[in-house]
Amino acid sequence: MSKFFYFLTVVITTFFLLTSCGLFKDKEKDIDTSDSRVFPVETVVKPDQSLRGIKVSLPKPVINKTWMQSTNNEAHNIQHPFVNNKIRLAWKINIGKGQNKKNPITSQPVIDETNIYTIDTKAKIVSLSKVNGKIKWEKKLRKKIDRDGILNGGLAVNEKYLVVTTGTGIVFVLDKENGKILWDIDLSITIRAAPIISGNSVLILTKDNRLSSYDLQEKKLNWTHEGLEEISTFMGSSMPTVSNGIVIVTYSSGEIYALNELNGSVIWNDNLSLYIQKQSLDNISDIRGNPVINDNKLYVISYSGKMISLDLNSGIRLWESNIGGIQTPWVVSRFIFVLSKDNELICLSSKDGKVIWVSKLKDFMDFEKKEKNILWTGPLLAGRMLIVSGSHGIIASISPYSGKFLGAINIKSSVETHAVVADRTVFFLTVGGDLLAYR
C-alpha cells in the first residue's frame, strides 16, 4: 500500500468517512477532519451478523450533580449523564506536580455537590470549585509518604469525608471541608486502587490481593479477605464494586469473589484465568478494569482476553466473550461499550455478549514505523456521545449508535486517566497536572 494511505490523523475508524467536528466548540483547537482519510485496518473483533439491523437505543441523558467515587459510584454504573451537544473549554488550572517515569498520574478527580478534589504525584490534595476552578484549600500529605511520590492509589468522597489512598500504603481520611486529617493508617503494602466508600465503611485493596473493610468514623478494621498473590500485574488495579449488600472484588490473579458486605464471608467465586503459562504480556490474567453491576448482573473484563457476565446473587455465568482489556466497560440499558486491548471500541449486547459494532482507534503515532504506542482511555458516555482520550493529546467523540467518528480536539497534552462528568461538565486531567473543564 502506498504512503498516500498512511496518515497522522486523530482517530482511525474502520468503516466510516470522518465527518465534521460535532462535539467541541473551541475553534482554535478543533481538528480539521475534512482532509482525513480512513486507513483500512482490519479489526480483531467482528460484529455478529445475527445482530445486523439491531438499533442501539439509550435512555434519555440525565444531569448528574456528583462523581463521588473514582468511577462515579460504588456500583461503577452511571448510565447516561447529560452534557450539551457542543461543549467548549470553560476553565483550566494546574493542580500540582505532573507525572514522571516513576510516578504516573492514575487518580481521577472526584466531585461532590460543590467541589472537585484532585491529587498530584506528590500527594498534594486540592479542593476546587467545580463551577470556576477556584481553589478552596490545599493539603500536602508529603511528610507522611516517601520522597518518590504516591505511585497509584486514589480518592473517594461522601457527605463528610474525603478518603485518600497512596501507593506507599497509607490511607488518609480527611474532613472534606478544610482538608484536616482526621485519621490515617499505614498498611505497609502498596495500594494501587482508589478507595470505595459504601455506607459507613471504606474498602481498601492492596497489591498483595488483600481487601480490607474499615469503619470510616472509628478507624476500626471490620474484616479482610485475601486472594492469590500475583507477580505479573499492571500498574494500578481494579476497585471493588458494591450493590445490595454484596461486595465484588476482582484480584490480579483473575479471581472474582462475591462477599457479604457486613462480614466479608464468601458468597460465590469465579476465575477469569486462562490457566496457561504466563510467558507473555497477553497471558496476564490481571483484571484492571472495574467490575460493573447493572440490573443485578455483573460484567467483568480481563486483559487475557475474557469478558463475562454473571448473575450477581448466584455467580452463574450468563455469557462470555473473547474480548480483553484494562478499561472499565460502560453499561447502559441493554448495551455495553468497552475499549479493548487492541484499541477497538466495541458495542455489545448486554443480554448475550454479541458484538453489534466495532470501531478501530489509532494504534501508533507513526504507523509506518509503528512507534509510540497510543494508549486510549474510556469510554465515557455523555450527551449521546462516547468520549475517549488518547495519550497523544487527542480527545475524540464517537457515536454510541453506530461507532461513527463525530469529532476531536487536540489539547496538546496526554490524558491517561478516565474523564469524569458532573453538572453538565466533562473534566480531563492531563499527565502534566492540568485540570480542564469542558461544558
Language model feature labels by segment:
Residues G22-K25:
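Bacterial signal peptide processing site
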Residues T71, D120-T121, I150, E159, ...:
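Structural signature of WD-repeat beta-propellers
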Residues V126, F172, S212, Y257, ...:
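WD40 beta-propeller blade core
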Residues S129-G133, D175-G179, D215-K219, E261-G264, ...:
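Short loop/turn segments that connect beta-strands within beta-propeller blades
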Residues L18-S20:
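C-terminal motif of bacterial Sec signal peptides marking the signal peptidase cleavage site
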Residues D30-D48, G53-A90, V266:
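Blade/loop signatures of beta-propeller domains
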Residues P61, A90-V110, E138-A156, L182-G199, ...:
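Extracytoplasmic beta-rich repeat domains
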